[in-house]
Structures are given as C-alpha cells and as structure tokens.
Amino acid sequence: MNTIQNIQQLREFLTVYNTLSERCFNACARDYTTSTLTKDEGSCVSQCIDKQMLVNRRFMLVFAEQAPKALFKQGEQSPTEAIKSAKPEPAVPAPEATPVETTPVIEENKQ
C-alpha cells in the first residue's frame, strides 16, 4: 500500500473507533465522581464493545458478499456507475396498485 492508502485506512479505523467509544461511553458511563469505571460500567462497556464488533463483523460479511453482485450486476457499466445506480432489492415485493373508488364525505353543519 502506498502512503495515501495507509492514511485513508487509518482515518477510517479512527472514525470507527471514535464512534464505538462514544456509543459505549454514552450508554454505560453513569458515575462521574471517580476517575475509573465502576464494576457495572466496566461490564457494560465490555458487552457494548462485543456487541458492536459482532454487528460490524456481520455487516462486513454481508457487504463482502453483496458488493460484487451490485458492482457487476450491469456488465456494461463501470464499477463506479454500477454503485451509483445500484438500488437495494426489497425483501418483499410491493403489492400491485389497484384503483380504489372513493365516495366523498359530506359533513352536515349542526347548529
């Protein structure tokens, strides 16, 4: 890797790290009277980090599986164009739209 790629990779890592730290701190830190975490806070942070890392790993696996399909779905497009035009496929097809006749509601003024 060249230097620019190393810097970009470091920047991405630090962004993920900072986001993870902020989420877990906001979710777990409750006692600001001490300079160390309480036992409950430490446990919460550990569970939070484990959960976030698991979610990140699952997300990356799905991304690694789906990205090539999206990139080369349309063979005539370049990978950049394919990414821009790729739309996520809905899990459930949308129902057919059917016209519905409506009857206007007339409100009576009661005085």
Curated annotation (Swiss-Prot):
Bias type Low complexity, positions: 94-105
One GO CC annotation, please?
mitochondrial inner membrane
Keywords linked to the UniProt accession = Disulfide bond, Membrane, Metal-binding, Mitochondrion, Mitochondrion inner membrane, Protein transport, Translocation, Transport, Zinc
- Compartment list: Mitochondrion inner membrane
Instruction: List where the motif Twin CX3C motif lies.
Output: 24-48
Q: Coiled-coil regions in this chain?
A: none
Tell me the Pfam families matching this sequence. zf-Tim10_DDP
Gene Ontology molecular functions = metal ion binding
Q: Which GO terms describe its biological process?
A: inductive cell migration; protein transport; regulation of multicellular organism growth
What family, per the record? Belongs to the small Tim family.
Q: What does this protein do?
A: Component of the TIM22 complex, a complex that mediates the import and insertion of multi-pass transmembrane proteins into the mitochondrial inner membrane. The TIM22 complex forms a twin-pore translocase that uses the membrane potential as the external driving force. In the TIM22 complex, it may act as a docking point for the soluble 70 kDa complex that guides the target proteins in transit through the aqueous mitochondrial intermembrane space.
Write out the domain note: The twin CX3C motif contains 4 conserved Cys residues that form 2 disulfide bonds in the mitochondrial intermembrane space. However, during the transit of tin-9.2/tim-10b from the cytoplasm into the mitochondrion, the Cys residues probably coordinate zinc, thereby preventing folding and allowing its transfer across the mitochondrial outer membrane.
Q: What is this protein called?
A: Mitochondrial import inner membrane translocase subunit Tim10B
- Species annotation: Caenorhabditis elegans
**What gene is this protein a product of?**
tin-9.2
